[in-house]
Amino acid sequence: MGPIMPPSKKPESTGISVSSQCYRSSTLSNPLHDDDDLDFPPPAVKINKEKGGMEDEELTNLNWLHESKNLLKSFGDTVLRSVSPVQDIDDDTPPSPAQSDMPYDAKQNPNCKPPYSFSCLIFMAIEDSPTKRLPVKDIYNWILEHFPYFANAPTGWKNSVRHNLSLNKCFKKVDKDRSQSIGKGSLWCIDPEYRQNLIQALKKTPYHPYSHVFNTPPTSPQAYQSTSVPPLWPGSTFFKKNGALLQVPPGVIQNGARVLNRGIFSGVRPLPINPIGAMAASVRNGIANCRTRMESEPSCGSPLVSSDPKDDHNYSSAKSANKRSSSPSDSISSSSADDHYEFAAKVCREGSDISFQSHESFSETEEEDKKQIKKELKDSLVESGYSSQHKKKQHLLKLRRIPSDALPLKKRRTEKPPESDDEEMKEAAGSLLHLAGIRSCLNNITNRTAKGQKEQKDKETTKN
């Protein structure tokens, strides 16, 4: 339903609809015709308000379309090009590139906010220092020196820098040197594990002047040398010194920190792939080879720990190290351990021979002592008559016993194991001690009775 106009303002010409007029005014491609016919006065809206609310929702005032040309000009070129795609009607020249595609220059636009995050600003400040570590106050000074915008900016940007330093994993604290006098605060450096992430964040800035170089990577490795990317903004001392940071092609960034040719990117230092872990792996391989040989050969007088993977927690690592040792690098790393093992094996073999001879002589003396003790015990038992009775009891018990194979499982479990020689020796020793105790008791009793008799005799003699 089109706008309702009073009879005095109705257009005389027929065949022109309101929709076609709105289309003409919205496109702004052709000059407007019949200004008298398209004049929509403000009272038209007031009349409709008196008629009802339903018609008011459907009607809109289109007077602002006539002033669109002046409104767009009043916004200015910078806002217009970055926000609205509508261009000046009278200008027939092709549109200029957007302001976001232009490189950022702090000298030309000192009041313009830089397009970098605070983590990128901190990264650039630390990398620009010769020692690759800075206190917080020096980071502030670097940002103020290279970006004049922050001189007049609110003071909250310093808090943002501090929060990024303390909360971001890319930055870590470093101990101060005694020679440095930086005052209060601690030094901050970049964690090498997250350095590549910061480089990627710098490359993703929308103000990069040569973003097409990263979007279309070269096909051949030789083309990497020719695609040299200038710094993000001209005249920067940081990128004059460390310009190679942002000259890494996208193929290298997508594949991580792997660099195809170190000669091409001399300024880029790839991330270390845990050198401590590599050293530990080589040492582990050498120890594992030594351990497996010691398991196969007799030990140097010490007992073998275990060959069961459940008992030995290093078993799996030793087996995996043996599989890895087939490579040439592992054989080189384990060569020194093999030399040490051969020398130790010779010494252990010589020591084992000496210890074995001494052990044999010591065992022979022990056996002779045991035989003598057994003979003495048997002689003492024969004198007491205990041995004959003990032998008879053992013989009767053997006759009464049922073979263990014929017993059920429960009785087999409850059945006590046969007494060993050590237990027999213990029983014999106990019986001897018991007999000795009885004899001592009898001797004491006889001595007491004898003393009592003597005392009585002495008393009787004294009375007489």
UniProtKB/Swiss-Prot annotation:
Residues 1-53, 85-108, 294-337, 381-428 are annotated as: Disordered. GO terms for biological process: negative regulation of DNA-templated transcription. It is found in: Nucleus. Residues 389-401 have a biased composition (Basic residues). Its main location: nucleus. Residues 316-336 have a biased composition (Low complexity). Residues 14-30 have a biased composition (Polar residues). It comes from the Eukaryota. SUPFAM superfamilies: Winged helix' DNA-binding domain (SSF46785). CDD domains: FH_FOXN3. SMART domains: FH (SM00339). The keyword Nucleus applies. Residues 113-209 bind DNA. InterPro entries: FH_FOXN3, Fork_head_dom, FOXN2/3-like, TF_fork_head_CS_1, TF_fork_head_CS_2, WH-like_DNA-bd_sf, WH_DNA-bd_sf. GO terms for molecular function: DNA-binding transcription factor activity; sequence-specific DNA binding. Keywords: Cell cycle, DNA-binding, Nucleus, Repressor, Transcription, Transcription regulation. GO terms for cellular component: nucleus. Acts as a transcriptional repressor. May be involved in DNA damage-inducible cell cycle arrests (checkpoints). PANTHER family: FORKHEAD BOX PROTEIN N3 (PTHR13962:SF20), FORKHEAD BOX PROTEIN N3-LIKE PROTEIN-RELATED (PTHR13962). This is Forkhead box protein N3. It comes from Xenopus tropicalis. The lineage of its organism: Eukaryota, Metazoa, Chordata, Craniata, Vertebrata. The gene is foxn3.
